[in-house]
Structure formats: structure tokens, C-alpha cells
UniProtKB/Swiss-Prot annotation:
Region named Disordered: 88-113
Similarity section: Belongs to the RESP18 family.
Designated name of the protein: Regulated endocrine-specific protein 18
GO cellular component, one term: Golgi apparatus
Location of this chain's protein in the cell: Endoplasmic reticulum; Golgi apparatus; Cytoplasmic vesicle, Secretory vesicle lumen
Span of the signal peptide: 1-29
Entries under Pfam families matching the protein: RESP18
Superkingdom of origin organism: Eukaryota
Stored InterPro entries: RESP18, RESP18_dom
Primary localisation category: endoplasmic reticulum
Functional summary from the UniProt entry: May play an important regulatory role in corticotrophs.
Organism: Bos taurus (Bovine)
Keywords: Cytoplasmic vesicle, Endoplasmic reticulum, Golgi apparatus, Signal
């Protein structure tokens, strides 16, 4: 029996984001295959996760492509909050969808400092949510993604993208 990535908790999210980053750099899902790199399978077939379909991957990929050129990283606190809200409150994206309900505003109030600058960048990047169609079969997907993203925001993994502890310490110039 094949072990599913979601059973590992937020590690499935890490793999998903890494895949999306790789996929956006290469130009599309047809450039990479799950077997040997010979363009044999598409996004929908690479991930055997129940409820995860191509529209979910595409939506996350669009979010990542919009934040990266503006010096925002998906691991930043504000970016995590926005991604969680975007994936969790799909009523803003899909008001006609029967499986979602209305939620509060997608962006928090403005705050001073670095966090305020990040919020301003995100507010400029996402003035209105893009319309993406979701059917009843994808309702489960939004809830799972939202739950995992909320868990990642609350309990981020330490050390994955961080610099090694020796970087910047005790450097000797030649």
C-alpha cells in the first residue's frame, strides 16, 4: 500500500511548495515527470493525494509566482497568513460554490514596521482574488489545504530554508 504524503502532516505541504517552486522555474508540469524527467506525466498524476487536483496546484502556483518577484518568500509570516486565508476562505474566490461560506476580509489592518511593509506589498499584489472554478469534489481539497497551511503557520519547521549556524559567525578575512 502506498503511503500518502498528508499522513506526515505539514511535510506534505513542504513537498507541495517545493514542487510548485520547481515547476514554476522549469516552465510547467510537462517539463518534469515523476518517473525519470522525460515528460511522461502531468501535475494531476504526479501527486497521488486524494482530493488534490490540478486547480489546487495551479492556484498555489499563481500565489507563489505573485509573491516571489516582490522579495516575499512563502515562509514569511505574512505570506503564510495570506496563503492560508486564500486557500482557506475560498468563498472570496468562489462565491457561487455551494461548499463554502463567507469569511472576514482577506487582509489584516495595516501595522507599522517590517510587518506593515510586507502587508502593503501583499495588499498591492492581491487587491482582488482571481476567479477560479471549484466543484463539489474539490470542497474536501480546500479544507485539507487550509488545515495544513494553518498548522504550518502555527508550527513552522525550523531549519529547512535557514542558513547553517556558522554563516555570519566568526568569519576570518583572507
Amino acid at each position: 500500500m502506498q503511503r500518502q504524503l498528508w499522513l506526515g502532516g505539514f511535510r506534505g505541504l513542504w513537498l507541495l511548495v517545493c514542487f510548485l517552486l520547481l515547476n514554476s522555474r522549469l516552465g510547467g508540469s510537462s517539463d518534469v515527470s515523476g518517473h525519470d524527467g522525460q515528460s511522461q506525466v502531468g501535475v494531476g498524476q504526479l501527486w497521488p493525494l486524494p482530493g488534490f487536483t490540478t486547480p489546487v496546484f495551479k492556484h498555489l502556483q499563481v500565489l507563489l509566482q505573485q509573491i516571489m518577484p516582490h522579495d516575499l518568500f512563502w515562509k514569511d509570516d505574512m505570506t503564510q497568513e495570506v496563503m492560508t486565508q486564500k486557500m482557506g476562505r475560498t468563498s472570496k474566490l468562489h462565491p457561487e460554490d455551494p461548499c463554502v461560506r463567507s469569511g472576514p476580509a482577506a487582509f489584516p489592518t495595516r501595522t507599522p514596521g517590517v510587518r506593515g511593509k510586507q502587508e502593503e506589498k501583499l495588499r498591492l499584489l492581491f487587491p482582488k482574488s482571481p476567479m477560479v472554478k471549484v466543484n463539489k469534489d474539490q470542497c474536501f481539497t480546500s479544507k485539507v489545504v487550509s488545515k495544513v497551511l494553518k498548522h504550518e503557520v502555527a508550527n513552522p519547521v525550523k531549519g529547512f530554508f535557514e542558513s547553517p549556524p556558522t554563516v555570519g559567525h566568526n568569519l576570518v578575512a583572507d
